[in-house]
């Protein structure tokens, strides 16, 4: 019998195919706003956007920039990189893209099967750094909201993964303990290292095939169905 009673799960790119939904939404918005006036291709836009976006999310996670600054800078940057100074256009891209993403019914393969297996056996909670207005919508769109007792969102609480305080909040607010809980996520730095720092066991969903990890997680899987063999 498993020692765990509570399973905290990251949403984006762990259960929800955020990358796929984002690319589809970005392409629609790119075409709608005729960004081909400024970029050689959609791929050029994404190549400019992606690394800067990752940097900004790291800053946001450390509390160095606000949510509004994150959105303003990351959507302005690709335009500025090709010599276009137009914050209004960048803001429209942001609004259009973010409104489209949660309407995409995209789940990581094996998601529904995993949740069907876990639901009768454990208390399930989402623990996410994603924006509050998007996460609930994504879960309703994909039909997975009812599997979860609660959504614990850093955007609502004001503390981001990997900070220990967020994991402690998650435990305290759900009546869980570190010893009877486990965290599932695809981001080593935020999900896995953060949980470990709070004394919580972890399942690293290594969907990207990362190697040379800073430390060995409690468990490591490359597909969601593998989690069934652990829990």
Residue ranges, per PLM feature:
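Asp-based, Mg2+/Mn2+-dependent phosphohydrolase catalytic module
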Residues: 1-7, 20, 112, 116, ...
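N-terminal helical cap/lid subdomain that shapes the substrate entry/recognition surface
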Residues: 2-108
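Structured helix-beta-strand junction loops
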Residues: 52, 120-121
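Glycine-centered short loops/turns at secondary-structure junctions
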Residues: 121-122, 199
